[in-house]
Design a protein with these regions (language model features):
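Short terminal alpha-helical segments
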Residues: 1-43
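Residue-level detector of alpha-helical secondary structure
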Residues: 43, 47-50, 90, 97
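Short hydrophobic interaction/assembly module
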Residues: 48-72
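Amphipathic alpha-helical binding modules
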Residues: 63-104
Length: 104
């Protein structure tokens, strides 16, 4: 009897594919909307994800790209704008970033 391995992508792998609708990364990278609820859902899942070289790379990728979104938003020469930007959201991201960094 063949044993099928569970090949369902974990939360981080799904985030890495920013074309998947309904993810934090898709909302921010493709729709220019910082969805705080989706970010919080991602953070809640982190303790359930095995720490591997791959998960570390993906977390670093998420941090880097979200940081780039904020940098681009503040760059007058860049057309990218976070539609729901506020100082409060940026401050929240700084808190969330620290949580993510603990898993790298």
């Amino acid at each position: 009897m063949d044993r099928k391995e569970n090949i369902t992508p974990n939360t981080l792998e799904i985030q890495k594919n920013d074309e998947i609708e309904g993810t934090f990364c898709h909302e921010l990278f493709e729709n220019s909307f910082f969805n705080e609820k989706l970010c919080q859902e991602l953070l809640v899942e982190l303790p359930n994800i095995n720490k591997t070289a791959s998960s570390t790379r993906i977390i670093k990728w998420i941090i880097s790209n979200v940081d780039t979104c904020f940098t681009s938003h503040h760059d007058d020469n860049d057309l990218y704008q976070i539609k729901n930007y506020s100082k409060k959201i940026e401050d929240k991201w700084k808190e969330y970033r620290q949580i993510l960094e603990k898993y790298t």
